[in-house]
Every structure is written in structure tokens, then in C-alpha cells.
Amino acid sequence: VIRGISSNIPFQAALLAHPRFVTGEFNTGFIAEHYAKGFSAEDVPHDDPDFLVALAAFMHRRYRARASGISGQLAGHEVKVGEQFVVVTLGHEGQNQQAQVTVSDFEGKSGSSAVMVGGKSYQISSNATLGQIRVQGSCNGQGFTAQVERGVGKNPLALRIAHNGTQ
């Protein structure tokens, strides 16, 4: 896990994915040619931005499951966990975007769920410990490693998800 004010992971991811870099057609002037005005991580979108939303919903559902199992809750006011959620993401220009999400077939012990985002289905499983920043798991049979941080900004319930150099 790389932490700090910022990191160069998005830049490295963009560099390694650039077609000229992939084919080996680069030289010492490559960065000056392609990033003369600087680099902005927002210019390199995630291959599947809905995966980030699905992972956020999956992790939120896991936190809600833990909260619902805490003993000593006030009778009649226990934490109830549904399947429908709205994930609010912050666009690169600061605007909020909302996504309707369904998290079903939740299995807390196995750490798996089916997540629907915008008509796409994601079968996510992970046994990562809540509060752990590095989360490993699988999505639709493919392994992933992501950074998941809870309590970012002024919202203690907010999640920051970073995967493959984007968030």
C-alpha cells in the first residue's frame, strides 16, 4: 500500500498502458512528448468504472452487516440492512454522481455477494478484514487487489476505492 499526500501510481499506470510504451516505441523524450502540459489522473479513466462502484457497495454492505450484529442495540431501533443502496461518487470536476446499486446473496462468512450496477452484474468475494486498506478478492472469477479506505474527508462513512491506479 502506497500512502501519502499523493502518489505516482496513476501516472505509472497510464504510462504502462500507453500504446507506444506497450509496443516498445518510446525514448527518453516520451514523457515530454505525451505529457508536456502535465499529467492528470482524471484523464485516465478506469477500464470499468462500475467495478469501483460495485466494490464500494460490496464493502459498505460488509460494514452494515457488522453493524447489525453488534449486541446491545436499542430495541426497535436495530440496524437493518437492505439490498438497495445509492453509491455517490465524486467526479473529477467535483460534481456528485449517483448510482443505484443492488447487493444481494450476501454471505458474510464466505465474504461474497452479487452486486448489480447499471444493468451489469458483479460477483464479488473477499475475505479481507474490515478496516484493512489492501483488499484482495475476486470479481466474476478474476482476481483483484484494491485499496479501500474508510472515513475519508469529513465523512466517517465515506469510502475511497483505488484500483489499477485509478479511484
Description of each model-found segment:
Residues 18, 27, 123-125, 135, ...:
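Short, solvent-exposed coil/turn linker segments
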Residues 1-121:
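Catalytic cores of soluble metabolic enzymes centered on carboxylation/carboxyl-transfer
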Residues 82-84, 131, 155, 164:
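A generic structural signal for well-ordered coil/turn residues at beta-strand boundaries
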Residues 44-47, 129, 155:
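Alpha-helix capping and helix-coil boundary motifs
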Residues 1, 145-147, 153-162, 166:
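ATP-dependent carboxylate/acyl-activation modules
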Residues 96-152:
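Low-complexity, glycine/alanine/valine/leucine- and proline-rich hydrophobic stretches
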